[in-house]
């Protein structure tokens, strides 16, 4: 049998030799790491993470080893945070120490090498971008200014469902179409002629990036051998195509439209970003570039479609599975809107019960059960244990939100629990952090939740719903599929009927 230099066996032999030499030369440490399961040589604890639902696997391990747990994931150390007390200590009390982002190979490609808010490292750049997000792009005032846009696209969405009355439809696909339309309009201000191309790229990108961690992320010493991965090359090609589309849009806007120095209430997101490029109104030491703008636009499109579609689908399925809750949602929405032709954002602000349903859905089914990993910038101590510099910090928000000591009957979908315990999910209550918290919390919570609430309100106002194929609500398969987010393994298929019939 002959081997060429490209033979996988040579890669494996090289890696084993490299690993053994590195371990022999590695200085011994007296640090006391958090408890965790025993490790195996080379792979560490990877054998214990087998399975498709890591948030559930990690919860079982944390139940045994504690809410602050150490795992060895290949060559990398990972600290797993699994209860509210520990989340507050690590993410709040030591927030600056864990403010960096752990950037994997796929994320690096998709974000122009860590530009944008999600994967930028902590510092002046991230601070500036978060200010732009929270004060201008996605502020409460700005989100309200988008109501007309949301409602116009909602009319198209409702009309599309009306054309399928009595016929089965896949909810996730229908909802995603609306979300792509709204985020493109709020970014570009009008119907973008390249929208369909961008949507295809985003869908393909989300499929290719569905595996959260790749071999080269777990074993950085193997990165040189993964450079020519087919998947990574496909991602690079998609991002190059998206880059060309966005560059043309930016150049065309700068040629044909005056970039205003002062903000306007009705300006789109691209106008905000271009103003910061041209005039730097925040007075930061640097101006944002076209690369920054393209990275921001791409992350906005991804976050505003995939995560929000997850929220809507899980909320819909839980409401349908509970007839008493379903009746309250129907009655509330139809009582507030009465004979109106469309549901507005201001109507939704009055739908307190339906909004509690969305909140409870994000507790039971967070779109990201494991918050985007952070990376420790320096050693620090927690309860006598050392969280080491360079370690990944993984927060299992699903485990926190399933804690029976905080949430009675945690598996039960109970929107009314917030009447008794009115906590919110904006990051100040560490018992409920589906969108993260602190310096790395999601700056787009209000935009995403508003869109999810508006979609659900319109669907329950205009239509009655039944499960396709004659299934009963209690027969819906709730099996999860973990990838870029946590979605239903078997997409929810429903049959709409006009409400007045």
Curated annotation (Swiss-Prot):
The Swiss-Prot or TrEMBL record lists the needed cofactor(s) as: heme
GO MF terms, alphabetically ordered: heme binding; iron ion binding; monooxygenase activity; oxidoreductase activity, acting on paired donors, with incorporation or reduction of molecular oxygen
CDD domains, per the entry: CYP71-like (cd11072)
Q: In which pathway does it act?
A: Alkaloid biosynthesis
The organism encoding this protein is Alstonia scholaris (Dogbane)
Q: Where are the transmembrane segments?
A: 1-21
**Protein name, please?**
Geissoschizine oxidase
- Its EC number is 1.14.19.80
Q: Where does heme bind?
A: 442
Q: Which domain of life is it from?
A: Eukaryota
Q: How does activity depend on pH?
A: Optimum pH is 6-7.
Q: What is the lineage of its organism?
A: Eukaryota, Viridiplantae, Streptophyta, Embryophyta, Tracheophyta
Reaction equations catalysed? (19E)-geissoschizine + reduced [NADPH--hemoprotein reductase] + O2 = akuammicine + formate + oxidized [NADPH--hemoprotein reductase] + H2O + H(+)
Please give the function described in this protein's UniProt entry.
A cytochrome P450 monooxygenase involved in the biosynthesis of strychnos monoterpene indole alkaloids (MIAs) natural products, compounds with effects on glucose absorption. Catalyzes the conversion of geissoschizine to akuammicine.
Q: Which GO terms describe its cellular component?
A: membrane
The record's section on InterPro entries has: Cyt_P450, Cyt_P450_CS, Cyt_P450_E_grp-I, Cyt_P450_sf
Family to which this protein belongs: Belongs to the cytochrome P450 family.
Q: What GO biological process terms does the UniProt entry carry, in alphabetical order?
A: indole alkaloid biosynthetic process
């Amino acid at each position: 049998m002959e081997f060429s230099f490209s033979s996988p066996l040579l890669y494996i032999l090289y890696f084993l030799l490299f690993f053994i030499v590195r371990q022999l030369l590695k200085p011994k440490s007296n640090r006391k790491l958090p408890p965790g399961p025993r490790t195996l040589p080379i792979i560490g604890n990877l054998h214990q993470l087998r399975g498709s639902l890591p948030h559930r696997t990690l919860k079982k391990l944390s139940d045994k080893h504690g809410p602050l747990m150490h795992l060895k994931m290949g060559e990398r150390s990972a600290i797993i945070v699994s209860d509210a007390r520990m989340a507050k200590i690590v993410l709040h009390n030591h927030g600056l120490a864990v403010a960096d982002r752990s950037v994997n190979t796929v994320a690096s490609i998709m974000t122009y090498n860590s530009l944008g808010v999600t994967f930028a490292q902590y510092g002046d750049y991230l601070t500036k971008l978060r200010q732009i997000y929270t004060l201008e792009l996605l502020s409460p005032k700005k989100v309200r200014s988008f109501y007309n846009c949301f409602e116009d696209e909602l009319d198209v969405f409702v009309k599309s469902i009306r054309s399928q009355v009595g016929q089965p439809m896949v909810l996730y696909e229908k909802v995603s179409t609306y979300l792509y339309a709204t985020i493109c309009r709020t970014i570009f201000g009008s119907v973008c002629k390249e929208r369909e191309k961008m949507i295809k790229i985003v869908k393909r990108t989300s499929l290719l990036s569905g595996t959260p961690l790749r071999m080269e992320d777990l074993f950085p010493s193997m990165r040189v051998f993964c450079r020519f991965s087919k998947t990574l090359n496909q991602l690079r090609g998609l991002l190059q195509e998206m880059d060309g589309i966005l560059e043309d849009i930016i150049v065309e806007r700068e040629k044909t439209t005056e970039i205003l120095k002062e903000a306007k209430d009705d300006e789109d997101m691209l106008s905000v970003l271009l103003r910061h490029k041209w005039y730097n109104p925040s007075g930061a030491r640097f101006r944002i570039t076209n690369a920054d703008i393209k990275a921001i636009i791409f992350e906005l499109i991804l976050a505003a479609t995939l995560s929000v579609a997850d929220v809507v689908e899980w909320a819909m399925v839980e409401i349908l599975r509970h007839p008493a809750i379903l009746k309250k949602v129907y009655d509330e929405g139809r009582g507030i809107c009465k004979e109106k032709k469309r549901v507005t954002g201001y109507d939704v602000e009055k739908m307190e019960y339906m909004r509690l349903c969305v909140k409870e859905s994000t507790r039971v089914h967070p779109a990201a059960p494991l918050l985007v990993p952070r990376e420790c910038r320096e050693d620090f101590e927690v309860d006598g244990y050392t969280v080491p510099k360079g370690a990944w910090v993984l927060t299992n928000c699903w485990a926190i939100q399933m804690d029976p000591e905080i949430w009675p009957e945690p598996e039960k979908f109970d929107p009314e629990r917030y009447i008794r315990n009115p906590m919110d999910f904006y990051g100040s209550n560490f018992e409920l952090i589906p969108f993260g918290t602190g310096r790395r919390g999601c700056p787009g919570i209000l935009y995403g939740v508003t869109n999810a609430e508006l979609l659900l309100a319109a669907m329950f106002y205009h239509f009655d719903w039944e499960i396709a194929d004659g299934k009963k609500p209690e027969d819906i398969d709730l099996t999860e599929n973990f990838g870029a987010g946590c979605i239903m393994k078997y997409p929810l298929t429903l049959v709409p009927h006009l409400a007045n019939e």
